[in-house]
Curated annotation (Swiss-Prot):
Binding site for S-adenosyl-L-methionine: Y39, G64, C65, S66, D89, N90, D117, I118, N132, R199
Family statement drawn from the similarity comment of this UniProt entry: Belongs to the class I-like SAM-binding methyltransferase superfamily. Cx-SAM synthase family.
An annotated Gene Ontology molecular function: carboxyl- or carbamoyltransferase activity
Gene Ontology terms: biological process: tRNA wobble uridine modification
Signal peptide limits: none
Function: Catalyzes the conversion of S-adenosyl-L-methionine (SAM) to carboxy-S-adenosyl-L-methionine (Cx-SAM).
Protein name (record): Carboxy-S-adenosyl-L-methionine synthase
InterPro entries: CmoA (IPR005271), Methyltransf_25 (IPR041698), SAM-dependent_MTases_sf (IPR029063)
Pfam families linked: Methyltransf_25
Catalytic activity of the protein: prephenate + S-adenosyl-L-methionine = carboxy-S-adenosyl-L-methionine + 3-phenylpyruvate + H2O
Enzyme Commission designation: 2.1.3.-
Domain of life where this protein originates: Bacteria
Native organism: Citrobacter koseri (strain ATCC BAA-895 / CDC 4225-83 / SGSC4696)
Length: 247
């Protein structure tokens, strides 16, 4: 059962950096629905993309799986034999709850849940990889190496789904979308104190890139095609395709 997010409703004397700890994991479903515009749409559409791209006898990777929402969406839309989903997160609290969520929904496609660092995971025989609001928490200099590894591990015809919060080179547009995002959170019941305290904790941990930067990295990794397929305010998702015909 998900609890309502009230983590930052009272003043916190010493705000440290953001961590995905037990307290965050407990309220995460409520938090992300009220904080990330379009999140439910992205999750459901990841399932539709899985139906199109996942191939028989291949693997799907959900890197930074949190509580397993994307994994469950993918699994509901896999209709091939001998597929496997590998869901990875480095937060013990998230992994514990992810196991419960996955176990609560029975389906023929097996899910391997791994507590570990996505930078250390081998990507092999993949028809689809999901990075759903994960890359932004890696150090910027480490992001290209991960995308390179994903491209190498994807089979021809495979897809990467990359969802992120974006920054914007046009500061006027950036400010507008930033303010609209804050309006969205206010409309969902967050106070100015909650918004401010959470932002302070995230600012040194979540470092955002522009869509142009993401596309440049994807191109450098080898992806022949990439495009923004969803955006709401300063949040969105890209799909990157590896050319070729699935075996």
């Amino acid at each position: 059962m998900s609890h309502r997010d009230t983590l930052f409703s009272a003043p916190i004397a010493s705000l440290g950096d953001w961590t995905f700890d037990e307290r965050v994991a407990e309220v995460f479903p409520d938090m992300i629905q009220r904080s990330v515009p379009g999140y439910s749409n992205i999750i459901s559409m990841i399932g539709m993309l899985a139906e199109r791209f996942v191939q028989p006898n291949t693997q799907v990777y959900d890197l930074g799986c949190s509580l397993g929402a994307a994994t469950l969406s993918v699994r509901r839309n896999i209709h091939h034999a001998n597929c496997k989903i590998i869901a990875v997160d480095n937060s013990p609290a998230m992994i514990e709850r992810c196991r419960r969520h996955i176990d609560a929904y029975k389906a023929p496609t097996p899910v391997e849940i791994v507590e570990g660092d996505i930078r250390d995971i081998s990507i092999e025989n993949a028809s689809m990889v999901v990075l759903n609001f994960t890359l932004q928490f890696l150090e910027p200099l480490e992001r290209q190496a991960l995308l390179d590894k994903i491209y190498q591990g994807l089979n021809p015809g495979g897809a990467l789904v990359l969802s992120e919060k974006f920054s914007f080179k046009d500061t006027t547009v950036g400010e507008l979308l930033f303010n609209m995002h804050h309006d969205f959170k206010r409309a969902n019941g967050y106070s100015e104190l909650e918004i401010s305290q959470k932002r302070s904790m995230l600012e040194n941990v979540m470092l955002t890139d522009s869509v142009e930067t993401h596309k440049a990295r994807l191109h450098q990794a080898g992806f022949e095609h990439s495009e923004l397929w969803f955006q709401c305010f300063n949040f969105g998702s890209l799909v990157a395709l590896k050319s070729g015909v699935p075996a």
